[in-house]
């Protein structure tokens, strides 16, 4: 983590699916908006960069291993972050969890003073790590992550409990052990107890303020 002043601060939040990444990202976002203003901070989700699969049938899309780094278009994410650092706006893809592919719509995203980047595989890519000014890893027990994922995917993403459990056993847990957990070594800060860890939130906010003022 650098101590120099930054025109754009990028904070990376990684960890298992349903480990609390989105919660801590949203909490930091909402609290910093009150200090910096709505146009000064934004959140980018790695999920938006799942590859376009419109050329595949639905049956083929369902079989994709979404917990493997190859499922994500990190080339485009690196390109977009580099453009934002340079002061250029980008169009972020939108991804449909029900259609398992990108949508035709995009989300315009203007340069911000602070960008919070959250996703399961962010720390597996050295190019993304090099763009981050600070990175954290949500170190939440897998059994808790599974319970949260069941509730989220059934209630919010139209999944069945059986399909969620099968995916967890087939790809989610194995890919966590192969890719996500080993990437913890690259994190500047490891956060236990999920996204409601108040000490971690306050520490990250203080770090962001420090980098903004130099």
Swiss-Prot record:
Q: Per the record, GO CC terms?
A: cytoplasm
Where in the sequence is the signal peptide annotated? none
Q: Which UniProt keywords apply?
A: ATP-binding, Cytoplasm, Kinase, Nucleotide-binding, Transferase
The reply on keyword Secreted is: no
Q: Where does ATP bind?
A: 15-22
BP term (GO), one: UMP salvage
InterPro entries cross-referenced by the UniProt entry:
P-loop_NTPase, PRK/URK, Uridine_kinase, Uridine_kinase-like
Could you tell me what reaction this enzyme catalyses? uridine + ATP = UMP + ADP + H(+); cytidine + ATP = CMP + ADP + H(+)
Chief place of localization: cytoplasm
Q: Which Pfam families match?
A: PRK (PF00485)
Q: Where in the cell is it found?
A: Cytoplasm
The entry lists its GO molecular-function terms as:
ATP binding; cytidine kinase activity; uridine kinase activity
> Pathway, per Swiss-Prot/TrEMBL?
Pyrimidine metabolism; CTP biosynthesis via salvage pathway; CTP from cytidine: step 1/3; Pyrimidine metabolism; UMP biosynthesis via salvage pathway; UMP from uridine: step 1/1
Q: Return the EC number.
A: 2.7.1.48
Protein family: Belongs to the uridine kinase family.
The protein in question is named Uridine kinase
Give the source species.
Answer: Aeromonas hydrophila subsp. hydrophila (strain ATCC 7966 / DSM 30187 / BCRC 13018 / CCUG 14551 / JCM 1027 / KCTC 2358 / NCIMB 9240 / NCTC 8049)
Q: Which gene encodes it?
A: udk
């Amino acid at each position: 983590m650098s101590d120099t002043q930054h025109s754009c601060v990028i904070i990376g939040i990684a960890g298992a699916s349903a480990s609390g990444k989105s919660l801590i990202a949203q909490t930091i976002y909402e609290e910093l908006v009150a200090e910096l203003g709505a146009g000064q901070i934004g959140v980018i989700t790695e999920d938006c960069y799942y590859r376009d699969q419109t050329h595949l049938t639905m049956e083929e899309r369902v079989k994709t291993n979404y917990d493997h780094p190859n499922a994500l278009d990190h080339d485009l994410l690196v390109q977009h972050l580099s453009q934002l650092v340079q002061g250029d706006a980008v169009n972020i893809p939108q991804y449909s969890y029900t259609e398992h592919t990108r949508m035709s719509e995009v989300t315009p995203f203007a340069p911000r003073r602070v960008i919070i980047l959250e996703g399961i595989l962010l720390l597996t890519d050295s190019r993304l790590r090099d763009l981050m000014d600070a990175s954290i890893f949500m170190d939440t027990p897998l059994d808790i992550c599974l319970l949260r994922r069941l509730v989220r995917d059934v209630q919010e993403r139209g999944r069945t409990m059986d399909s969620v459990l099968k995916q967890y056993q087939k790809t989610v847990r194995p890919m966590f052990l192969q890719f996500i957990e080993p990437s913890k070594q690259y994190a500047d800060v490891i956060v236990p107890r999920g996204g409601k860890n108040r000490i971690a939130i306050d520490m990250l906010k203080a770090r962001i303020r420090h980098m903004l003022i130099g």
